[in-house]
């Protein structure tokens, strides 16, 4: 049964497999993250996601043992229009990356629910280079890169949705220290989506999650030249495209991994065609009597979920 604010699921009596554990499963939609946790604390819901913005409030509370944290396959990054008059200059893109304090961003702004990025590919995706360290934070070097290129006070606008506003504001402060002006504008999600597809955004913040652990699904879908146009980034490097195409056509898994490592390095460390920020973590809370609660790559796995009535 579906209603605007919830979905009620009951067992299918004709299902061919084993009997399910629960007599009913109710999924309730609650937009406000604080209201959602209030409902959880009052016992009106048995499990729910815990927003990163509230993690600091709950991680040392009485609910700390009810929190489960997972790392999905995605990467959060500063998505930039590589053909923009300001951002088309590689020196500007490199300086932006150097100016960002990813460690502080993860520990303070994101309350520890993130890991500083070292490449575009997530560590859980074959093709991620585990030997790479997190991107360097060096404001002095960022200023020198700009000075050597004869650039002073580069200015651009980063338009974001409300969820990314806090991140954008932090980036704005980091870039200011290096003499880079990033104006931040928060826009409606629908307008954002249309503007990105039309290539109207100089820069924005994106979390990009592959549907499964394969670099083709994470990197080809966003930065292969034909796809990059629709994402509003217009990245175009024939060498990168060639590596991606070769990896797509290969059936040798080890070879594919090496090809993706090279492609990622070109994209995110030679061209700075993208500015990876962090690998986000997700968390949810579940009552002690909830059994087999799992969260995979952005998806709750509910097929084995059960309730231990002796603990309720």
PLM region descriptions:
Residues 12-58, 181:
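Ligand-site clamp/hinge motif
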Residues 8, 88-173, 177-178, 262, ...:
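Append "and occasionally in soluble cytosolic enzymes with long acidic Gly/Pro-rich linkers
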Residues 45-51, 202-207, 276:
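Paired acidic/hydrophobic, glycine-rich loop segments that form the ligand-binding mouth/hinge
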Residues 51-62, 210-215:
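A ligand-binding cleft/hinge motif common to bilobed small-molecule-binding domains
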Residues 3, 126, 147-211, 279-282:
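Ligand/substrate-recognition segments at binding pockets and active sites
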Residues 17-22, 58-71, 79-90, 123-144, ...:
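Short, solvent-exposed loop/beta-turn-alpha elements that line the ligand-binding surface or hinge
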Residues 36-37, 45, 54-55, 92, ...:
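Short, hydrophobic alpha-helical packing/hinge segments within bilobed ligand-binding/sensory domains
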Residues 1-10, 257-258, 298-312:
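The feature preferentially marks the first beta-strand/turn patch immediately downstream
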